[in-house]
């Protein structure tokens, strides 16, 4: 939002410089991103009057002008602008002057003719071509009103001004208007805010005699109103109004359109003006668009509408796309005489979806998306009527034609001075606090120690007590919050909690395994919200998301980790190994808080070990990813088991559930080839664990085991089994019959192919035996080995 200091002073009187004002506003929570000074780098710029114009004797495209610049004699200026003519008041840069871009004005000769100055266009004095009236796009600027030659041109243009650029957070939509900003500034300086004139001299003729309004979708359009103004004269708007629009980043068009945009900036209430005679009927019907319905918008583009779009119609044909853009045949033209002014409240979500789908973002749609102040809807329309009467010679019909309900102008919130003081450490009296609320334009009611604050609708960011406390702190001054030392009943030495200690251990293990920690957004698109979810539960969707990509709370960490991996690979960082510990969210019943669960996830793609001069290249595979997960289990003194599984988004043959005490706590697997290809990834492996579940079981420490004093033995066994039998089933059988001397097992070879029956595979397993109390004998080991082999044969294995 661009805030003109000259315009702001119309509502609130302050003596501070603009830089001091900007500093004060920033300190209270609205960041002033930039200060734009329209006088910067400009010197000796005056108003000139072109007394005569003659063709240059030696150049067809140049003119020799005699220009009165308020000095004793006119000066001669050679000008090449196609629209220069005698009798014009123009902008002149005098000799010795300076223009933006370091341009210095000197005496010169152009094709033999003396030139003592420069007649300027708006571009040449620093105005962006995007905001210049179309009539002056390719020539010099010509004043539409008489001026005094020699006076300061920037003053005559209302450009001797500084503009603050606000970087607003979404919750402060009230500051998207001059009046909203004026309320804020008045509160900071404890001064009064003056609102603009809105009262018109009305005709006896009623707007109700010429128009009816019907809303067919009040759930999407709670309120719609219209007023009628007759006999307007279409002409350029006053210079001061054009200047304010230019400084706000809007191109002036004509007085009627400019008044609509002016009130939008003034009140933050979007208006739309229809040519009453072009509407085609005496009724306005607001409804949802019909499927496949089409309309041509003001940009001469035919739009195909959806049933989610809101349209304004003449009873049959759409004449405007609500809150986004008007229709072409009802737009205000040079021949327009009678105006219908629309003021309405539209559903923010519907407007956002329509504007984004059609790529029609505008000043109006952005304000509707954030929600508008009900208190200003009718007032803004009345203000437009007053301005049309004053600057377009319009005749305002009495009465307002409306349908629906505006809704509450205020929201009452109860609070006490004690609550405020305890929260922010102030010692303010009840009167001090009431004064601050009154400074902000909030009415109050007092009942003993309870202050009922009547929050106006323009401040949609204030809904709870804590919001009121923040307002008191902002206006009183964050810098004035007293410094106090904390008081503790009991002082204890600091240390990590058990949870913090375990989390730190896991991070160290993963970092030691070569993974880097990532931190990603908790918000994902609605499509990704349930991707890889271990609990198929309802998602938590935001009511007013900033974008479709951040519309829901995640149920898995993997969607964003996949995005991060894809982002890195696209930038030639092809070996990606990442992990994240973060929260996921699951909805409960209506009115209940959601479940918030901490997860641990990882993603690996590319080479795990780079092929350098002293190392062998090792590409990421399933077993390497499983080894990373096993390191986590070992560090937490847990024992995972794995079970084959089918999980959406993962390779059907290379995916397993991770079990802890026979309960599923996670999964591991290769990203499905289609999903990997969609993200420009090669073979990629992921894992996800319910970290809360691990923490609930983990002891967090490993008992010390002395180094064995007696030697162990190893036996290898090769088994031929059906290819569908998982190795994990065989290992379970081995451990079940291995007694207390079988310490661990290792699958070191799997073979399928020649010399084996179709549908069979060979698995080689190493069994490690150890007795910590005595030396093992061959007979003892052979006996256990025989029991194991018998159990395996019973399971269907063939000993090779």
Swiss-Prot record:
Family affiliation: Belongs to the phenylalanyl-tRNA synthetase beta subunit family. Type 1 subfamily.
Alphabetized SUPFAM superfamilies for the sequence: Anticodon-binding domain of PheRS (SSF54991), Class II aaRS and biotin synthetases (SSF55681), Nucleic acid-binding proteins (SSF50249), PheT/TilS domain (SSF56037), Putative DNA-binding domain (SSF46955)
Subunit structure: Tetramer of two alpha and two beta subunits.
Protein name: Phenylalanine--tRNA ligase beta subunit
Species per Swiss-Prot/TrEMBL record: Staphylococcus aureus
Sorted UniProt keywords: Aminoacyl-tRNA synthetase, ATP-binding, Cytoplasm, Ligase, Magnesium, Metal-binding, Nucleotide-binding, Protein biosynthesis, RNA-binding, tRNA-binding
Classification via Pfam families: B3_4, B5, FDX-ACB, tRNA_bind, tRNA_synthFbeta
Location of the B5 domain: 408-483
Reactions accelerated catalytically: tRNA(Phe) + L-phenylalanine + ATP = L-phenylalanyl-tRNA(Phe) + AMP + diphosphate + H(+)
Co-factor binding details: Binds 2 magnesium ions per tetramer.
GO biological process per UniProt: phenylalanyl-tRNA aminoacylation
Gene Ontology MF term list: ATP binding; catalytic activity, acting on a protein; magnesium ion binding; phenylalanine-tRNA ligase activity; transferase activity; tRNA binding
Chain positions recorded as Mg(2+) binding sites: 461, 467, 470-471
First-listed, main subcellular location of the protein, grouped into a coarse class: cytoplasm
Cofactor(s) essential for the protein: Mg(2+)
Organism taxonomic ancestry: Bacteria, Bacillati, Bacillota, Bacilli, Bacillales
């Amino acid at each position: 939002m661009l805030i003109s200091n000259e315009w702001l002073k119309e509502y609130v009187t302050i003596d501070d410089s603009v830089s001091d004002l900007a500093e004060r506003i920033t300190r209270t929570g609205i960041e002033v991103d930039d200060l734009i000074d329209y006088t910067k780098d400009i010197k000796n710029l005056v108003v000139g009057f072109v007394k005569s114009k003659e063709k240059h004797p030696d150049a067809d495209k140049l003119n020799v002008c005699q220009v009165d610049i308020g000095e004793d004699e006119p000066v001669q200026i050679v000008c090449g602008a196609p629209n220069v003519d005698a009798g014009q008041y123009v902008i002149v840069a005098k000799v010795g002057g300076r223009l933006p871009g370091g341009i210095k004005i000197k005496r010169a000769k152009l094709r033999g003719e003396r030139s003592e100055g420069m007649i300027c266009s708006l571009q040449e004095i620093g105005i962006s071509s995007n905001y210049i009236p179309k009539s002056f796009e390719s020539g010099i600027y010509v004043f539409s009103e008489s001026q005094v030659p020699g006076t300061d041109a920037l003053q005559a243009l209302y450009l001797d001004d500084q503009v603050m650029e606000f970087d607003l957070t979404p919750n402060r939509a009230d500051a998207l208007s001059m009046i909203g900003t004026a309320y804020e500034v008045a509160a900071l300086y404890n001064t009064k805010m003056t609102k603009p004139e809105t009262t018109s001299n009305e005709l006896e003729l009623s707007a109700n005699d010429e128009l009816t309004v019907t809303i067919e979708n009040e759930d999407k359009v709670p309120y719609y109103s219209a007023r009628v103004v007759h006999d307007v004269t279409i002409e350029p708007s006053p210079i001061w109004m054009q200047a304010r629009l230019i400084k706000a980043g809007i191109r002036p068009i004509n007085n009627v359109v400019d008044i609509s945009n002016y009130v939008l900036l003034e009140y933050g209430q979007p208006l739309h003006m229809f040519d009453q005679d072009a509407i085609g009927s005496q009724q306005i019907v607001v409804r949802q668009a019909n499927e496949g319905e089409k309309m041509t918008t003001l940009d001469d583009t035919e739009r195909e509408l959806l049933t989610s779009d809101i349209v304004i119609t003449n009873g049959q044909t759409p004449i405007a796309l609500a809150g986004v853009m008007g229709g072409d045949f009802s737009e205000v033209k040079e021949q327009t005489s009678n105006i219908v002014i629309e003021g309405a409240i539209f559903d923010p979500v519907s407007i956002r979806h329509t504007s984004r789908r059609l790529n029609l973002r505008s000043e109006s749609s952005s304000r509707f998306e954030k929600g508008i102040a009900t208190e200003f809807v009718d007032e803004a329309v009345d203000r437009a009527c007053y301005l049309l009467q004053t600057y377009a010679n319009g005749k305002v019909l009495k009465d307002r034609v409306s349908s629906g309900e505006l809704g509450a102008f205020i929201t009452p919130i109860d609070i006490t001075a004690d609550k405020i003081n305890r929260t922010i450490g102030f010692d303010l009296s009840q009167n001090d606090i009431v004064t601050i609320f009154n400074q902000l334009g909030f009415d109050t009611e007092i009942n003993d120690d309870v202050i009922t604050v009547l929050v106006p609708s323009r401040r949609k960011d204030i809904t709870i007590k804590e919001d009121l406390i923040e307002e008191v702190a902002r206006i009183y001054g964050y810098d004035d919050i007293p410094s106090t030392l904390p008081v503790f009943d009991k002082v204890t030495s600091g240390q990590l909690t058990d949870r913090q200690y375990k989390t730190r251990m896991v991070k160290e293990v993963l970092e030691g395994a070569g993974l880097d920690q990532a931190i990603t957004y908790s918000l994902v698109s609605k499509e990704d919200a349930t991707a890889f979810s271990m609990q198929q539960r309802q998602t938590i969707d935001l009511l007013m998301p900033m974008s479709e990509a951040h519309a829901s709370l995640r149920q898995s960490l993997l969607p964003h980790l996949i995005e991060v991996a894809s982002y890195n690979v696209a930038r030639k960082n092809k070996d990606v190994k990442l992990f994240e510990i973060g929260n996921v969210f699951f909805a409960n019943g209506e009115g209940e808080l959601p479940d918030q669960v901490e997860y641990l996830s990882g993603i690996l793609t590319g080479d795990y070990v780079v092929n350098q001069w002293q190392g062998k290249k090792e590409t990421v595979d399933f077993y390497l990813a499983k080894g990373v997960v096993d390191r986590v289990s070992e560090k937490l003194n847990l024992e995972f088991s794995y079970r084959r599984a089918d999980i959406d988004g993962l390779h059907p043959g290379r995916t397993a559930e991770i079990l802890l005490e026979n309960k599923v706590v996670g999964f591991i697997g290769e990203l499905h080839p289609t999903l990997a290809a969609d993200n420009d990834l090669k073979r990629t492996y992921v894992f996800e664990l319910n970290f809360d579940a691990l923490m609930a079981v983990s002891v967090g420490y490993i008992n010390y085991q002395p180094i064995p004093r007696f030697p162990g033995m190893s036996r290898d066994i090769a088994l031929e089994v059906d290819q569908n039998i998982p190795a994990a089933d065989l290992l379970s059988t081995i451990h079940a019959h291995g007694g207390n001397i079988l310490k661990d097992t290792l699958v070191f070879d799997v073979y399928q192919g020649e010399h084996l029956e179709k549908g069979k595979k060979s698995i080689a397993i190493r069994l490690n035996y150890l007795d910590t109390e005595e030396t093992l004998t061959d007979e003892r080991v052979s006996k256990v080995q025989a029991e194991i082999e018998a159990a395996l044969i019973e399971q269907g294995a063939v000993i090779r």
